Amino acid sequence: MGTTAQLVPTELLPEALAALAKQMEQDDLDPSLTQSIVKDLLTDPGKEGYKAAGPLKARAVQIRTESMAPPTATVVNGNVRTVIALVGTSGAGKTTAAAKLAAHFVAQDKRVALISTDTDRVGGLEQIRAYGSILNLSVDLAYTADEMREAMQNRRDADLIIVDTAGISPIDEVQKEILKELLREAAPNEIHLVLSAPTGLRQMRDAIQGFKDVGVDRLLFTRLDETNRYGAACSVAIESSISVSYLTNSRMVPGDIYATEPATLSKALFVRTLNGTAGS
């Protein structure tokens, strides 16, 4: 499905499809994606069966899901150490996401270690240490490449190491170089860009573009409980072709982290809630 489409006047659309297009627009889905989905539905061989809202939404979910990269949740098998890094802007929810991930794998009897590189945020160190205490995990601090190397060595027996990085601006090249240096020492298998779901489409796009050269290969959306508009998240997931790994609700640890199934985010757009659309 392309990201550009000629506008179809709403008044020319069947009633149910016009209502669906309006909902997608109100939910901040990129307008060109909305129009592309509308045109796909208009030309779909089964369009006569989509006159009711239910079947129409179901087909729209399917179309949008087919446009996204397959989801890729983290797999920890215990035979080879897995290292994941969470990157993103300040306030995206990286530390809480790191703790939720840690709790998720602790519950699977995995040996989990946390490493924090956040030296700047007020209360950041106390927050991750508090999460570590809740989960009975020690937290290593690594503010330099040498400290990261030492922390990785100290936690060499872990099944999973989660590196919670400091929030930085996607256009701050100096801070990005520092981040890259730390990541070179950590050598993560996965780099998740953490995006807060209430964030606007333009800001999400800027973050994805800005962190691209860091090696991001997954998107992790947080705070889905703080909005009922998931169009921006759906839009960037489609446009970027980057897999979505996890969705999170709330700041509760443990809990409220969902490994994305193929249609999770698409369904959430229409039902306006994450609950019931994915399994943790």
Predicted regions and their residues:
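NTP-binding/hydrolysis catalytic cores, primarily Walker-type P-loop NTPases
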Residues: 1, 235-280
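Primarily NTPase-proximal linker/entry elements flanking Walker-type ATP/GTP-binding cores
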Residues: 1-111, 115-120, 130-144
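Residue-level signature of catalytic and energy-coupling elements of molecular machines
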Residues: 30, 95, 128, 164, ...
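Inter-motif core of Ras-like GTPase G domains
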Residues: 110-113, 153-162, 174-199
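Conserved beta-strand/loop subsegment of P-loop NTPase cores
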Residues: 113, 188-195, 212-227, 231-254
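Conserved nucleotide-binding/hydrolysis micro-motifs of P-loop NTPases
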Residues: 119-122, 146-147, 167-170, 197-201, ...
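Conserved ATPase-coupling elements of RecA-like P-loop NTPase cores
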Residues: 125-126, 170-176, 203-204, 230-232
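Conserved nucleotide-sensing/catalytic segment adjacent to the nucleotide-binding pocket
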Residues: 132-167
